[in-house]
Amino acid sequence: KILKFSKKLGVNIIKRPLSLCKDDSSSESAIKNVLDNLSFRVDNIIFLQVTSPLREPSDIDKAYRRLISTKSDSIFSCHKAEDYFEIWSKKGNKEKYIPITIDYKNRKPRQLFKEDHFMANGSIFIFKKEILSKFNNRLGGKINVYEMEEWQSLQLDDIKQINAMEILFKNKLKKFYV
């Protein structure tokens, strides 16, 4: 149904092979498949995550201009982290937790953090084609960020987030999309 609808709109469709339609298929492999099937040359890739849709109309243009003006190779969208999150990982089924973002043995007060911290929000990735070829990743080379508002970092991965998005849409986003 989606393919038929897209064809009616004149969209150039590149079907993803079944080998790239698995739960563990990477976005990078899907992007490479598209690039291999294009009939024209591509220098930069703009990759928008469907589960991170809160972009204002100008965000993509601003992110692209930032990539160019900073002579970066790749850029990702984020928001400034006003709080420093301690992220831990559970190791297997055991009650063993490993710190990811902190050194708990040498903890310093948050007031002593001088540098800004940023949380990637997954909304926008822009990168040079050769970065994907060289690193098999959307990020590499000179990496930069495009800063967005924190409310734009809401994800759409489960029903709670979808409900929160509906509330946000009614209260803040309607002016952009209606």
For the regions a protein language model found, what residue spans apply to each?
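Short phosphate-binding loop-to-helix
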Residues: 2-46, 54-58, 62
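Hydrophobic helical membrane-anchoring modules
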Residues: 134, 145-178
